[in-house]
Amino acid sequence: VFTSGSTGKPKLMMAEKARMEASARMTCQALGLHPGNKALVCLPMDYIAGKMMVVRSLVCQLQMVSIEPQGHPMTAIADDEVIDFAAMVPMQVFNSLSNETELRRLKAIKNILIGGGAIDKELELQLRQFPHAVWSSYGMTETLSHIALRKINGGNADDNLWYRPLPGVGITLDANDCLVIDAPAVCPTVLHTHDIAVVDRSQGYVRFKIVGRIDNVVCSGGVKIQIEEVEQALAPHLSAPFIMAKRPSKKYGEEMVMLTEAADATRIMTVCHDVLPKYWQPKEIIQVDQIPMTETGKPKRNLF
């Protein structure tokens, strides 16, 4: 399998069949899936998310409903098709809200698992109204997809972005506050991630939330800025797609810039000045035709 390429070129990785099987059983048990349930396979087979949907179907005896990966997966299923489980990326879910037919079919799915990228706040608010279970997942290729889940709607929903590890998964932090995962059933070694996190054990169980990637920390003039926090602060005020990125600077060491599809850079800079602290403000607004993304739909930030 290939890694997602979040921080560079996707890398080839060997996965053990026994560990893929263990991961599949963990998911099916967590979601209460049973033999005969229908699983929608709508993700590319080139990456772990698509492969694991097939493995889950084989291991847990689910009926596969396989369609060509596309941005509007709900257009490829019938109104009377009963889907018990579907895994999608945020873009597919967002696109499926665009018309009544797709929305109706999406709402009929019994378990929707969303992974591969952050879920926009506005999208999450809409998903909270869904009648069946919607989950946000945390994981990566090295853990053979997700090792933690967060309920978005219904009972036990968590709107504060806390994830709960699946049974058999241990969570700690390293000296840089990055998440360390000990999941021997799916990963042969302890995995040190690049995700800065907060771990909480005060509720009688372990939970964690992701602050951002350590790769996305901008050290500008002695001030450390987490790119994801800047994006979250700006998101409610900007309608056009945008991302923040960092580049080398002779003056500051590193500096933050914004890439945006918006036409009016002056207005965008005004919003940044009004909303952001002084040291969070981008040094330049770069207008692009389309925000650069990886093959798995994640922002491509290593551009400079």
Feature-to-residue mapping (PLM):
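AMP-binding/adenylate-forming
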Residues: 15-22, 38-95
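Gly/Ser/Thr-rich phosphate-binding loop
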Residues: 99-156
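AMP-binding/adenylate-forming catalytic core of the ANL superfamily
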Residues: 194-280
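Conserved S/T- and glycine-rich ATP-binding loop of Class I adenylate-forming
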Residues: 3-6, 39, 54, 86, ...
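Active-site glycine-centered loops adjacent to acidic/histidine catalytic or metal-binding residues
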Residues: 6, 116, 139, 195, ...
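AMP-binding/adenylate-forming catalytic domain of the ANL superfamily
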Residues: 277-298
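Conserved AMP-binding A3 loop
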Residues: 1-25, 32
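AMP-binding/adenylate-forming core of the ANL superfamily
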Residues: 170-198, 261
